[in-house]
Each structure stands twice: as structure tokens, then as C-alpha cells.
Amino acid sequence: MLITSSLLPPSGTWIFNINSLFCSLSIKNALSNLPLMRFCNSSTTQHTSTLVISLFIISPENIIFFFRIFYYCDNMEREEFLKYLRQGKYDKLAKLINSYSDILSFLDELFTSNKKDDVRRALLVLKRLDNEVIERYLYYILLNLNEKRIIAKEAEEILKKITNKESVEEAILEIAKKPLDEKIVYLFLQNMKEGNIFFRAILEHTKSKNMEESIKILLKNYNSEMILKILANKLYSSEKDERELTINILLNIVDSLTDEQKNILRGHLSVSLLGDEDKKLYRKFKQLFEKLDIPAELSDEQIKSLLKSHGKTTLNIILRENIKLPANFYNREFLKDFLYTGDEEKQFVGVKLISLKKDSKKKVDLLFRFLNYGYGKAKTAAIRELKKIAQNNNELKKYIENKTLMYAKKMNLGLKISSLRILKEFAKKEHLEFLINEHKRLKELVYKLEEEKFMGGFRHLLMMEEEIRKCNVAMRLIEEIVAEICLKNDIHYNDLKISEKLGYEFYRTMELIGVKNLNLIDIHEFLEDVKRDGELITYLSGIVINNNKIDDNLAKKILEVTEKAEMEDKDVLNANKIMIYASLNRVDKIGEIINMAEGYYSKLAFINGVKKFIDEKLLDEEKINLLIPKIAEMIYSTKKLRLMALEFFKNYPNELVLPILINEIGNYRGEDKLMIDVISNVIFKYPNNIHSIRELLNTDKRNSALKILLKVSEKRPELLEDFIYLLAGMYSSANEEDKKLIKKILKNITTEEQKLILKPIIGDL
């Protein structure tokens, strides 16, 4: 900007507050050297300095020079501030701010920047300042509680400092007792969830017993439009609990809103809310819409628009509100939006929309398109819908069958697999020749792919292996369909003459037939095959596990073959042997079973085998105690084995495992609930072990111990009579979550008289 003398006041005396311009004495020194100027009536103190500048001669050059000095000094102060900040000289900055409060404007800039490191440094400076200054930045401090830990930690320390409280939650509640800036109130509302600290802070601030009452008070005292906007936005939260809390509040206050407030709320509610996945919440949203006279009707264009932006949600609305889609809806644009996008979720919605259409050849054709081009669950949904039509519509059944056979003949393996899944629904005798020939084609393709897979790079290898996997899936499906046809038409497996036609057998087909009807296979010939090739024991175990009509003579022959069977993978071999022994109730083999359970699969089989023996009441307490350590050691194993072992002990509690469970609880993320259930069941069966939980209360696993005691208090409150005053003594030093648990436990185990005694310590129970 060009400064001229015409923009300046007349010659005379100008008075400036030095602090408001420069914030350091270095600037006065710079000004003192200005030519053609002199200082008079200058007085300086630590906090204020007033400078009177008398201008003897005013010229454009002098004025431009004067403003340049001011600009230079202001930037010099900013650079000095940032320099100290980057160097971590927070104490020095704090002293500077205490001397020259206008520097706080630089602190404001740090908090409003998007740079996390600057915010952290600003908090480090802030916590060194006086409480009066800190309280000016209370909004930013609370805002940063939700940031990453390195920032949130500094914010927590500041809150504890200004309130003299030991915990952040107590500090926030203390702050809530005072008058609050509206931005802080809105922040509390935005972060409010059922029972959390911000929820309690709002109750504390409004001195209310429930949230509905609190919101009514806030609507009177603060900007009602902002409050309603925040509540409306929470209805779109991804968290169900947050949506549920908010809709409950709105339903309770909506009748007390003014017409203007209702209009504000209407403006923030979208019909897409009626598509909530939770049906209970849908009914509540519907109720709110009715109270506000918001129509749920949608035009065809609105439906199309919503389907593009909120596919699954809009689908729910269409289904719940019985919205009829127009006949021309399923056009090219529909296929473009819901099929050719390649988006699995959109394709799934597309299939569901087609399922609303009346059964017809066009509907079947559309579903086959999704079968051809769809992915994942969209393809699965199309298969399910085609099966459903075939079952319920005889006119279209033949049409679907012919189309399925046509697609099954194609060598697009993904499409072939999907077609075979539908063909399984028909399982006609006439399909046998086609299925056997397709199996041969697939087998030959596997041989070819095996030869070619090492002829390219790593990517080529992965592609070939994926194709081989698809071939194996398709062949397995064919074997299952052939079994289904044999069982349905009472055809003996040998009559198929598969070995003569192909040079190999369908052992999966034999297994599936043998499970349901041993008369339709030559079991003795099959056992001879197992003798020659131990790998076939997997099919034998399938028959033995699922067929409970095996007589003693056959069982004896099966045992002989099983004992002698050999294969390369010892773990899989042992797993199958264990399951055969258990299925034939051979408890005399228990020692051998224990020794065989060494690998992953054999250990899984061992757990299932022991369950079978216990359910059949073949094991006494002494034998069970011999088996328990083997299962207990699996708690230290892989996740799958650990969960299997925990499920076992949940159903078959044993006190021998209790020390391991107590030691391991809390060590595996997401498994605490199951461990708590297991420990609780052990205590129900062996009540004397409750003392173990008493000891756990004095460790860092107190929260888990309290959850166990809560479960015990619900079923066996008499076991916890000795815990009443121990828990009451812990209450004052416990965190908020533990306090809630202690209260619930004491409520379950105390008499009315004891509740009155504990009231001064615990409050109402």
C-alpha cells in the first residue's frame, strides 16, 4: 500500500502503547534512532510503556520509513516467538507472555493451525502460564483431549492443574460446575455418549437428573439452532449407541419444542434415517418423523438419487415402506449403476432390488447377468435368488435349469462354479453324463495348469494357482452333485462306472453317499483303497463321524484299517485317527489319543474327541482330570486352539484350569469376555475358589476381577457376602468404570440395611 501525507493526521504529537505494538524493548531502541524524530515524556515500566512521539518534520519518505520499522519489528517478534517455540524454550516463552500479554495472539494462531506439533507445543507453553490465562484457552484444551496420546496427555495435565484434581474426569466435572463459553457446551454435546464424562458434565452443568431435562435447559440458555443441529448430526453417527441415545432424547423433547425449533430440526433430518440397519431404531426414527410431520414418501427421481449415494440405506427404506419401483427402473442405467461399477456393495444392492421384481424371464436374465459379472456376496445373493425362484415357480424352473447348464459348460471358472451351485438344486439323473465329462475336462485343465505354472514369473505362478484352486472347487461341487443324484434316485455308486470312464474315483462322492446310505457304496472295497492309499483316511473319517449306523463288524474292520493307515502329513493323519476312535466310542484308545495330539489339527480333533467321550458319559472324573492338562496347555497356543480350549472349559468347567485362566486374563485382546465366562462357570461349580478372585482384586487385573464378581453376584450372591466391605473400601480410589461395577455388585449382594450403611460411601444402590 502506498502511504502519502494526505493519509496522515496533522503535524503534532502521536501517543502509542508500546506493548500493543511491539512487546519488547528492542523496538523502542529502533525507534529512538529514527531521523528527524525525538522522544519526549517517555516513561517505561515492566508492564506498560507509553511513548509520545513528536514529529517536527513530516514527509512521505519519513512516514514510509516509520511504517517499515513497525512492520519489520512485528515480524521480528513473530520470528523470535517461533524460534523459541521450535527450540523448546517454553519457560522463556511463558515469561515473555506474562510480561507482554499481546504475544498471546501468536498462541491463538498455533491452536487454530492444522499442525499437530504446533498444537502440542502451544499446550506445553500454556501449562506454564497462570490459571487466568489458561482458562481463556479452555475450549482448545478440551478439544485436544480426543487427539493422539502425545497431545491429549498435555491437555489432561493442564486440566488437572487448573482444577487441582487427580483425574481428568474429576477435572471436567469441576469445570462443568462453572459458567461455560457456548463453544465448550457445544463441544460437550458433540462428544456426548451414554454415561461418558461429557454426558455427566452436561448433567452437572445444568444441574439435571436426566439428559432430556438438560437439553431443554441448554435450548433456553444457548443457541437452540446450534444445539439442535448438533443433535441432528449425531443421528447420522456410525455408532449405534450414539444414534440410540440421541433419538431417545429427541423423542422426549420434541413435543416441548417451539414451531421455530421444530422447523430447524426438520431441516437437518433426511429420509435416509429411515434406512437405519437397526429395526428398533428405524421405528423410533419413524415415530420422530410422524411427530414432526415429515413425509416418508419418495419420488422415483429421489429414489434413484438416494440409491446412488446411500444404496443399502435406501434399499432398507424401500423394503420397510413398501415402495413400488416403476417398471422402467431396471434399464441400462440401472445395470450401469449397480452391475458394471465393479463395486461389490452396489452389486449386492442391485441383486436385492431385482429380487423385488415380480418373477419373470426378464428377472431371471438380470440375475444371470449378476451371476456373470458380479463379485462376492452379490454373486452369492444372485445364486440364492435363482434357487428360490426355481423352488417356487415351476414355469421358470426349466428356464433356469437350461440357462444354468449353458453357463456351466463355459470354461469361465468363476461362472462355472456359480452355475454348479445352482445346478445342485436340480440334481437330475439326466445331468450325470454332463457332470462326469465336466469333471474330466477340469482334471485335464489342472494337469495343464500344473505344467504351466512355473513357466512365468511370480505373478504368473499366483494366477495359475488361483485357477487350479477354482478347478478343485468346481470338481468338488460336481462330486457333491453326483452324490445328491445317487441318493435322490437310489443309484449305487458302482453303477456310475466312474473309474472305467475316467481312470480315477470320486471319493468325495463315496463319502457323502456313505454318510447317509452305506448300502449305495461298496464300503469294503473303499477300505481296501484306504489301505493302499492312507491319504483317503480323510474320506473314511467323514463317513465314520457322520454315520451312526455302523455295526460292530464294520467298526472292527474300520479300526484295523485306521491303525495301519499312513500318510505324509502326520498331523492330519492323527487328527483323522482321533476322530474315528472318538466316533466309534473307543475310550480304550485314550492313551494313544493323548499321544497323537501334538499338531494343530490333531489338537483340534483331540478337543472334539474328548467332548464326544464326555457327552457319551464314557469318562469318569479321574480320566477327565488326566485329559484336562492337555487341553489347558492349548490356552497358550494359537488363537483358534485357545478359543476352542476356552469354549471347552466354558461347557465343562474344571478347577484345575483356574490358575492358568487367572494368570492369562487380560493378555489377549477381545477374549476377556470369554475368559470371564469360563472363570465364572468354574466358580459356580467349585465355589471355594472364590478366594482366587479376592487376590486378583489387588492386582492390575482388578477390572476383570470385578466383572467376574458381577457375574457371580447375579447367580450366586451368597458367595460374595465377605466381599461387601472390601469392595466398599475400594470404591473411593477406583476409576469411573470400576465404580460402576462395584455399585452393581453391591446392589446384588447387600440387604436393605447394608445399603443404608454404605450410602455415605457409595451413594444410592
Curated annotation (Swiss-Prot):
InterPro entries: ARM-type_fold. SUPFAM superfamilies: ARM repeat. This is Uncharacterized protein MJ1626.
